[in-house]
A protein has these predicted regions:
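Mature catalytic domains of secreted/periplasmic carbohydrate-active enzymes
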Residues: 22-450, 454, 458, 466-481, ...
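C-terminal motif of bacterial Sec signal peptides marking the signal peptidase cleavage site
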Residues: 17-18
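Sec-dependent N-terminal signal peptides
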Residues: 6-14
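Aromatic, loop-rich ligand-recognition surfaces of beta-strand-rich domains
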Residues: 374, 378, 382, 393, ...
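Surface-exposed loop and turn segments in beta-propeller and other repeat-based domains
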Residues: 588-589
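Positively charged n-region of N-terminal signal peptides that target proteins for export
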Residues: 1-5
Length: 626
């Protein structure tokens, strides 16, 4: 007969790193260990102070802003004129106030995207805002943003793309120019532009790495403090076998910004998609085949599951590495227009918040300003409503006044109760209350992520009923349950990697359902025979079988296989199949990482008997008409 054991601990317990026989660490070698030893070691892998700070931020903002804002492209080409960035007005206070009001803690800004265009007053190039007409070439978007962040109490992060199409395409470009590495001083002195920070570095690097390091120095010493450096792994194009001296980058970053996390490297990882999705079990203890603390290149982690027992045993090292879930509030990372470009609903963003933040990850929501330097009104409405829902749902803890171990309700992540497999604890409310959300947290900073399976019961009309089961907890697990009226909750630990340390439990009520419809308004698609495409070379012609009125096309890469990061083309119409009129052109960036439907809206609806798409890498059978 199974006898249930009940936790009776009433006082907070705290763990000390390295105490007893346990060894708590951020990275541990497991090569040659048996399965049981590996799981024991995994239970003691903990975040660094910087990683814990990143998890505690929970909800942060991304801002994509640059020449693409004015060209309507997702990825630039590197051939853009400096004057393409035709900004006349800028309101970073509006950005930061909206971000702060939504409950976000940090802003990450695209100081340089893949096009290589610089959004601050750099000493090391004239391809950037310094050559635009904005404020007579003296404008500095990053400086304005830095000041607004300080004003509104937000942390600042920078996105500095390692890829650089301008430095690839320019005749005098530094990327892949086959320059010889030699010992160079960082930062390189520029007459009339001295640095107040007198730190110097010596690195054996080539031209492009020197350029990148000089700009990192500018950003980290003149716009800080910087809390995150976002190193995107996307590369639209490469040249000359260019490599990155990440050891030098890391040394400079750790010296100048010791509290900054490096995304895309050992500190923070990509969740594996750009659609706001997390794994059902998003473990932050993950396997590596080599020591992640000394690697110079980090591959995207796409596996699902990623940190389960079987996956851990396949590695040679275990490492704590939180996931960021990046997604844009619009169908695209840059603003294109206020007419056709869709904006996510508050239902959708709130759902992603609960699944990502409540799934042991960080939600990074992109908010692209428009060509007037402001957030568009419909984006603001989504952001405002999302923030309101977060506050009204999670700002009130319905377990206040409950009877349970003190450590569970003291809001201190370092105090906790210990729970073994088969044990449980009970939280008794002062009276019956309606709830539909339950939040649990583990003491990951001092003990680690250990819960593998658990269940929660509610006492309803005097009887215990199971209302939820789940897998890992980690930093935070949000359980969304049906509306119930209860006077007690019971947590049951079903499986773990070691003694579990539960640091917090709370209950809440959301007036909004846990599920949502479509994130965007989707045009009604027209039916047509997809076998009617005729393909010759790069030209794909569709015989419409009569006069049809068309508003545009939609490409759905998720239904097929996309080998290319960029798909571009031209759409034309004809009444006889001989004489063609161009009605639109398109360029889809980043289809591999974000395989969501892409809409091409014609300037005006058109009537036609034939439709032609000229593109080198487009499967016409994945096209819809509207």
């Amino acid at each position: 007969m199974h006898i249930r054991k009940t936790i009776t601990i009433l006082a907070a317990l705290s763990a000390v790193a390295g105490c007893g026989t346990r060894k708590y660490c951020n990275t541990v070698k497991i090569d040659g260990d048996d399965g049981n030893t590996i799981i024991e070691k995994a239970a003691d892998v903990v975040p660094t102070a910087n990683q814990l700070a990143a998890l505690d931020r929970e909800f942060i903002a991304f801002i994509h802003f640059g020449p693409n804002t004015f060209t309507g492209k997702e990825w630039g080409s590197g051939f853009e004129s400096s004057e393409t960035f035709a900004l006349e007005t800028l309101d970073t206070d509006q950005w930061c106030k909206a971000i702060k009001d939504a409950g976000m803690k940090m802003v990450i800004f695209t100081a340089k995207h893949h096009d290589g265009y610089i959004m601050w007053q750099s000493r090391y190039t004239d391809h950037g805002i310094m050559s635009s007409k904005f404020r007579d070439g003296k404008g500095d978007v990053l400086k304005d943003l830095s000041e607004s962040c300080r004003k509104y109490g937000l942390e600042l992060g920078i996105y500095l793309s390692p890829a650089d199409l301008y430095q690839i395409e320019s005749p005098d470009g530094l990327y892949g120019n086959l320059s010889r590495p030699f010992l160079r001083t960082i930062p390189r002195e520029v007459e009339g532009r001295p640095f107040s920070n007198k730190t110097k570095f010596k690195f054996n690097v080539d031209d492009y790495n020197e350029y990148y390091l000089n700009q990192l120095f500018e950003l980290l010493t003149e716009y800080g403090p910087i809390s995150e450096i976002w190193l995107d792994g996307a590369h639209p194009k490469t040249k000359g076998g260019q490599t990155y001296n990440y050891n030098a980058w890391r040394e400079l970053i750790r010296t100048l910004a010791p509290k900054a996390n490096i995304f895309g490297r050992e500190d923070l990882r990509w969740c594996g998609n750009e659609g706001g999705h997390t794994r059902d079990s998003e473990w932050n203890v993950v396997p590596y085949m080599a020591n992640p603390d000394t690697l110079t290149w980090y591959s995207d982690m796409m596996a699902d599951p990623l940190g389960g027992r079987e996956q851990l045993c396949e590695g040679k090292y275990l490492h704590y590495q939180p996931a960021e879930t990046d997604v844009s509030v619009r169908d695209g990372w840059f603003w294109r227009d206020n007419t056709h470009q869709q904006t996510r609903t508050a239902d959708n963003v709130f759902d992603m918040y609960e699944r990502s933040v409540g799934g042991n990850a960080i939600l990074l929501l992109n908010l692209p300003p428009d060509n007037q330097g402001r957030f568009p009104e419909k984006d603001l409405k989504t952001l405002e409503e999302t923030g309101r829902r977060i506050r009204e749902t999670y700002g009130i803890d319905l377990l206040e006044g409950a009877k349970c171990p003190k450590a569970l309700l003291d809001n201190n992540i370092d105090t906790y109760i210990k729970v073994k497999d088969g044990e449980d604890f009970i939280v008794t409310l002062p009276e019956k209350r309606w709830i539909n959300r339950i939040v649990l947290q583990e003491a990951i900073a001092t003990v680690g992520e250990r819960t593998e399976r658990f269940a929660v019961d509610a006492r309803i009309d005097g009887e215990w009923k199971e209302i939820a089961t789940s897998t890992n907890i980690g930093h935070k697990r949000i359980l969304r349950v049906n509306d119930i009226e209860t006077d007690a909750l019971r947590f049951r630990l079903l499986q773990s990697r070691a003694m579990v340390a539960i640091s917090k439990i709370s209950a809440h009520y959301s007036h909004w359902g846990p599920f949502y419809g479509n994130p965007f308004d989707i045009p009604e698609l027209q039916d047509y025979d997809k076998n009617a495409w005729k393909t010759e070379g790069n030209s794909n012609v569709l015989v419409l079988g009569g006069q049809r009125r068309l508003g545009g096309i939609v490409y759905n890469p998720a239904a097929g296989k996309s080998e290319s990061g960029i798909v571009s083309g031209v759409v034309s119409i004809s009444d006889d199949g001989l004489s063609w009129t161009e009605v639109s052109s398109f360029e889809f960036g980043n289809l591999v990482n974000d395989p969501t439907p892409r809409y091409v809206h014609f300037h005006n609806p058109v009537g036609s008997r034939y439709l032609r798409i000229v593109s080198e890498s487009l499967d016409p059978t994945l096209i819809g008409l509207f």
